[in-house]
Amino acid sequence: MINAVGGNIPGATIGDDQSIFDNKIQDTIKAIELNLYGTIIPTLIFGELIAEKGKGSIINISSLAASRPLTRVLGYTVAKHGIDGFTKWMSTELALRYGDQVRVNAIAPGVFLTEQNRTLLTNEDGSYTDRAQKFINGTPYRRLGDPSELEGTLIYLLSDASAFVSGEVVFVDGGFNSWCGV
């Protein structure tokens, strides 16, 4: 099962001309609910079916934001931290109760240009925004990811090739999380 519920809420994004204290708390709560509960609830529902079957793999979608906090998106960052902790907890809980054939992992994508974040990362003329350029400059690959580049990791984590892998958060980010910038 790939659990890919999530995203951000426009009102939960702190504008360039705002401070953290201008944050709309209700929208931040909605972003946390969307991402964290949007992961926990389906994992519990489908996880029970997988556990009863005695074999399966659950993959939650985390984010580089859980490891390297992103500015302007408080609720999203907090929720992704929660997803990492929940993934580790759930993997342990299922393994201890149902054995080593039930696995839970997460992938933490770096910055991928998608329809969901296009307005945040590109200008109207198609050029990159300053924010996108900061991500590119902080990534050893010097580019944004293509969503198709997540497929290999997803296939691996769903397959028997990862039979001894559980409770892990795998970064797919062009080296962003690993690089200090020098």
Q: What is the meaning of each model-derived region?
A:
Residues 15-18, 111-139, 179-182:
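A glycine/serine/threonine-rich, flexible loop-to-helix segment
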Residues 21-40, 55, 59, 83-84, ...:
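Catalytic Tyr-X3-Lys loop
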Residues 98, 103, 165-167:
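Short, small/polar-rich loop/turn modules that mediate ligand/substrate recognition or access, typified
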Residues 68, 155, 166-182:
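Short C-terminal tail/terminal secondary-structure segment
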Residues 43, 79, 87:
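Active-site helix of classical SDR
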Residues 63:
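Residue(s) in the substrate-gating loop at a strand-loop-helix junction
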Residues 7-29, 52, 72-75:
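Conserved mid-core segment of classical short-chain dehydrogenase/reductases
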Residues 30-52, 66, 91-96:
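Amphipathic alpha-helical dimer-interface segment in Rossmann-like NAD(P)H-dependent oxidoreductases
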